[in-house]
Structures are given as structure tokens and as C-alpha cells.
């Protein structure tokens, strides 16, 4: 199963992520966002940030998840490449760790700055093989 793919969107970037579980799909959504920013294959998982979030539905939880990761990029220049998550769909909570390192011009390619997550075209679909998440980020 592929992790994520990009799709055409006027002036922004559309991302479709996949996962056998909801946690894997959320992780791949985050990986897709950071792939817009840099080559995630060069991001070493040397530091982590613990993340605890709750939402009013799964789409809101995804929105908060991506925004939280972008907050760490904006405030600490943290870029991430590995995620360990647990999502409770009954209480609509996410808890986990995002692993990565601080952006370093000598190691990491500077691609496009992702300004924010959006609700535009945001959907989370359960399929026979797992989950498909579709969303757009503002660049």
C-alpha cells in the first residue's frame, strides 16, 4: 500500500494518504505534509515531541494533528519523518510521538513552506483495505 500522493490544486497542495489503520493513515498524512517541506528520507528520528489532542470529530482531529506538527516546524524548525500514534475513535483523541530533527540547511533540502492545514476537501474514508484521507494544505 502506498503511503501518500499529491494531487493538483490551484495555489495549494492536495494530499491523499493511505493506511491499513487510522493511525497509519494519520502518520502518512503527516509524512506527506513534511515531504512538501523537505525530503523526509533525510530526516533522522533523533528527537521527539509528545502530542496529545482531542477533537469533535475525526476530521477536526486530523486538522489539529497537522496544525500541531506545523507549530513545531514554525516555532522550533522541527521536521518529522516517523510517527507513533494511538487514536481512540470513541473519545476522538490522539496520543503519540512525532520523531525527527531540527531543519539544517547542510542536510535538508528546502522545498516549499506549508503555511497551514485547511478544511478544504478534507475527508476520511474507511475502505475495504483501510483508510484514505484527502486534504489540502495552504502554501
From Swiss-Prot:
Q: Which residues cross the membrane?
A: none
Q: Which cysteines are joined by disulfide bonds?
A: none
Which UniProt keyword terms apply here?
Calcium, Metal-binding, tRNA processing
Q: Which residues bind Ca(2+)?
A: 12, 138-139
What this chain does, per the record? Activates the tRNA-splicing ligase complex by facilitating the enzymatic turnover of catalytic subunit RtcB. Acts by promoting the guanylylation of RtcB, a key intermediate step in tRNA ligation. Can also alter the NTP specificity of RtcB such that ATP, dGTP or ITP is used efficiently.
Q: Which family does it belong to?
A: Belongs to the archease family.
Q: What is this protein called?
A: Protein archease
Native source species: Saccharolobus solfataricus (strain ATCC 35092 / DSM 1617 / JCM 11322 / P2) (Sulfolobus solfataricus)
Amino acid at each position: 500500500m502506498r503511503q501518500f500522493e499529491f494531487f493538483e490544486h490551484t495555489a495549494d497542495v492536495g494530499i491523499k494518504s493511505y493506511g491499513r489503520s487510522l493511525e497509519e493513515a494519520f502518520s502518512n498524512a503527516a509524512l506527506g505534509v513534511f515531504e512538501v517541506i523537505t525530503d523526509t528520507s533525510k530526516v533522522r528520528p533523533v528527537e521527539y515531541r509528545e502530542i496529545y489532542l482531542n477533537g469533535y470529530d475525526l476530521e477536526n482531529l486530523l486538522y489539529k494533528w497537522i496544525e500541531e506538527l506545523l507549530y513545531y516546524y514554525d516555532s522550533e524548525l522541527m521536521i518529522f519523518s516517523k510517527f507513533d500514534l494511538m487514536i481512540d475513535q470513541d473519545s476522538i483523541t490522539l496520543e503519540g510521538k512525532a520523531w525527527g530533527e531540527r531543519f539544517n540547511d547542510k542536510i535538508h533540502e528546502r522545498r516549499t513552506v506549508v503555511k497551514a492545514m485547511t478544511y478544504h476537501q478534507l475527508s476520511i474514508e474507511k475502505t475495504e483495505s483501510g483508510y484514505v484521507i484527502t486534504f489540502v494544505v495552504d502554501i
